[in-house]
Amino acid sequence: MAAASAQGGRTGGGGGSSGPGGGPTCGSGSGRSGLLDKWKIDDKPVKIDKWDGSAVKNSLDDSAKKVLLEKYKYVENFGLIDGRLTICTISCFFAIVALIWDYMHPFPESKPVLALCVISYFVMMGILTIYTSYKEKSIFLVAHRKDPTGMDPDDIWQLSSSLKRFDDKYTLKLTFISGRTKQQREAEFTKSIAKFFDHSGTLVMDAYEPEISRLHDSLATERKIK
């Protein structure tokens, strides 16, 4: 398949150089092919069990993230993940304190401290649940686009997705938040996962990448108009 793609690329390049006005068209095609070829060379093809919903969703999420970070050169922001890790770290701190205190002051002497740590741990777990449900939601990427002039705040791009259990419909949502106006716009698509994986379970980036780019470009065009 790689050889065939290379053969097609050489053939298309020859046609562009010989025909009038063909240069720009072939150049654009080569740009996209170059990006996809780079992924195929640098990374092993993503191959998963098509019947494993979590693996399917994770592979699609990771590839969508790769498009925004590598093709559009956005910078990932780890604030959401850091918030979750902070809550988990505090929860673990209470568990460790309870363990050490009970070792140094055997039960029942340690009872008040153990009770406090247990209550605190479950409170933190409740906070974590609220955080993941209402703050993180299904967002798996927050990326910043730096203003070229350095005058305006960064634009923010967010990726979120969903794939229901026993369902083949994958939904990818891209959210744009203007750094200057704080206005938020969204675009999404819902497609069958069969469109993006071949019969062996290998992710076909040639079919998936254009869908992501189309989402991005629709929001980027609106941003330029406004």
From Swiss-Prot:
InterPro entries: Spc2/SPCS2. GO terms for cellular component: endoplasmic reticulum membrane; signal peptidase complex. This is Signal peptidase complex subunit 2. The modification N6-acetyllysine is found at K169, K191. GO terms for biological process: protein targeting to ER; signal peptide processing. The modification N-acetylalanine is found at A2. Residues 2-86, 133-226 are cytoplasmic. Residues 9-32 have a biased composition (Gly residues). It comes from Canis lupus familiaris. It is a multi-pass membrane protein. Its main location: endoplasmic reticulum. Keywords: Acetylation, Endoplasmic reticulum, Membrane, Transmembrane, Transmembrane helix. Component of the signal peptidase complex paralog A (SPC-A) composed of a catalytic subunit SEC11A and three accessory subunits SPCS1, SPCS2 and SPCS3. Component of the signal peptidase complex paralog C (SPC-C) composed of a catalytic subunit SEC11C and three accessory subunits SPCS1, SPCS2 and SPCS3. Within the complex, interacts with SEC11A or SEC11C and SPCS1. The complex induces a local thinning of the ER membrane which is used to measure the length of the signal peptide (SP) h-region of protein substrates. The chain crosses the membrane at residues 87-107, 112-132. Coiled coil: none annotated. It is found in: Endoplasmic reticulum membrane. Belongs to the SPCS2 family. Residues 108-111 are lumenal. Component of the signal peptidase complex (SPC) which catalyzes the cleavage of N-terminal signal sequences from nascent proteins as they are translocated into the lumen of the endoplasmic reticulum. Enhances the enzymatic activity of SPC and facilitates the interactions between different components of the translocation site. Residues 1-37 are annotated as: Disordered.
